[in-house]
């Protein structure tokens, strides 16, 4: 019995360590991509995979006249539910991270923010220009936003493998750059990949957001008062023509960061509860009894309310986004049915797809690191920003190469940019190949440039 308990505990410990490892999210994403590609291309599973993605979803209510569509009369499929529904939570988490970085993190002051923000800007402009140089005037031109994004899960995951080789300042730089890059990608989606906007629905959504803002200002900290209007705002965005995922980012900006209780109140109240707990009568084998449980619940509630709602939600949602939502998104979108080797000829130009593969591949592999590096170099040389402490130009370029891992956000933009399924599929193949090449290049360069530093 003891041996079984010990093995069970060790299994739980290994599982917890895996979930907490910075590279685990990237590994799960990679597995999801591999499974999706296999299911989409194996003869026995290809049809079933496509049928699964195209299952219609509708929330319905039963009225006097029978069943009627309530929420999704536009014929929402399982795949679009993942893209328009589940990904809202992903963007909500990104919004919380951006807000945290702006308020208390690496983007909280001009001095801290200038280098990663300029690097992110360069890492978006140069890939877009490279893509546009291949596709200007073609049917593939709208895809210029695809190679401008960085997948933070993969980039940070790979960098964490070299924890003893890379200066901590460069890890902070890449994290801040990825957050700024996400903000840029969100703006690109909002400005260039929306549909015709229904101004009435948008106005109603804005009024509700103003109400959420005032809830924040008056100090309301009960999550239900934010959750219900947030769902309404998402629905209004969904029907308004603005991509519904952006509602997650907007709502995140109004979630309060300030805790309900001050440090002094928390310390005083917790001290009183601890004293009351110790004074409560208790036999040696009777802990916790009902009275103890009351005090423990009070202490737990006090500790929870002494952490801002924004931080609590970020901590709560992060594992679900990393290990559930993003893998589902990858599973639903990375499964490209390859019925011809033509799909792998990403440098081939066709009248139907333009040079979409060439633009994406070189935008990620060349444009991203070049843009990040040149913007950083100019910022440091003109004394607008300071070089990350302990970092050299070679290592900064190696880390910049990891910025070419687009994947999640790039695939998301790919699905928005094109209506033609063939162009979307070719774009996904190019994203996977460009991201893989960027990951390999960044890994090799980090290994080469940091090799001498490992000798102690």
Task: List each model region and its residues.
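Hydrophobic core segments of alpha-helical transmembrane domains in multi-pass membrane transport
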Residues: 28-41, 90-96, 126-128, 208-213, ...
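Functional cores that coordinate and move charged inorganic groups
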Residues: 159-271
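C-terminal ends of transmembrane helices
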Residues: 12-16, 92-108, 156-167, 210-221, ...
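Entry/N-cap segments of selected transmembrane alpha helices
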Residues: 101-128, 198-207, 340-370, 397, ...
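Hydrophobic transmembrane alpha-helices of secondary-active transporters
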Residues: 69-71, 80-104, 320-343, 361, ...
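Interfacial/capping segments of alpha-helical transmembrane domains
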Residues: 33-63
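Predominantly late transmembrane helices and immediately cytosolic-facing juxtamembrane segments
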Residues: 2-21, 226-229, 244-389, 453-456
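Structural signature of hydrophobic alpha-helical transmembrane segments
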Residues: 51, 80-91, 139-153, 194-207, ...
């Amino acid at each position: 019995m003891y041996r079984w308990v010990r093995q069970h505990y060790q299994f739980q410990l290994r599982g917890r360590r895996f979930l907490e490892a910075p590279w685990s999210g990237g590994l799960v994403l990679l597995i999801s991509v591999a499974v999706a590609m296999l299911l989409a291309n194996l003869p026995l599973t290809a049809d079933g995979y496509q049928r699964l993605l195209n299952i219609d979803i509708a929330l319905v209510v039963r009225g006097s006249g029978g069943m009627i569509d309530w929420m999704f009369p536009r014929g929402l499929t399982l795949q679009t539910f993942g893209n328009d529904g589940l990904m809202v939570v992903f963007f909500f988490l990104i919004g919380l991270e951006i807000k945290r970085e702006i308020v208390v993190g690496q983007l909280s002051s001009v001095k801290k923010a200038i280098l990663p923000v300029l690097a992110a800007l360069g890492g978006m402009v140069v890939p877009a220009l490279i893509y546009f140089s291949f596709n200007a005037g073609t049917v593939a031109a709208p895809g210029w936003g695809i190679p401008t994004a960085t997948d933070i899960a993969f980039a940070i995951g790979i960098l964490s493998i070299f924890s003893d080789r890379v200066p901590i300042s460069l890890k902070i730089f890449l994290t801040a750059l990825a957050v700024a890059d996400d903000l840029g990608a969100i703006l690109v989606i909002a400005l260039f990949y929306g549909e015709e906007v229904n101004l009435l629905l948008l106005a109603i959504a804005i009024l509700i957001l103003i109400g959420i803002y005032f809830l924040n200002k008056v100090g309301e900290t009960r999550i239900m008062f934010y959750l219900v209007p947030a769902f309404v705002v998402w629905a209004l965005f969904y029907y308004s023509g603005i991509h519904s995922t952006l509602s997650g980012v907007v709502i995140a900006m109004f979630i309060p960061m300030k805790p309900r209780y001050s440090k002094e109140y928390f310390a005083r109240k917790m001290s009183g509860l601890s004293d009351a707990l110790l004074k409560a009568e208790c036999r040696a084998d009777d802990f916790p009894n009902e009275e103890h449980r009351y005090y423990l619940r009070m202490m737990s509630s006090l500790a929870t309310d002494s952490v801002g709602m924004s931080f609590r939600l970020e901590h709560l949602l992060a594992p679900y986004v990393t290990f559930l939502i993003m893998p589902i998104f990858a599973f639903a979108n990375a499964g490209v049915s390859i019925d011809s080797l033509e799909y792998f000829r990403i440098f081939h130009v066709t009248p139907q797809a333009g040079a979409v593969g060439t633009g994406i591949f070189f935008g990620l592999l060349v444009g991203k690191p070049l843009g990040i590096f040149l913007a950083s170099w100019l910022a440091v040389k003109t004394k607008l920003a300071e070089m990350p402490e302990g970092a050299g130009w070679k290592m900064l370029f190696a880390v910049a190469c990891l910025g070419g891992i687009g994947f999640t956000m790039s695939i998301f933009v790919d699905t928005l940019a094109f209506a033609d399924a063939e162009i979307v599929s070719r774009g996904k193949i190019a994203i996977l190949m460009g991201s893989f090449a960027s990951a390999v290049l960044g890994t090799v360069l980090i290994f080469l440039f940091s090799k001498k530093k490992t000798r102690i």
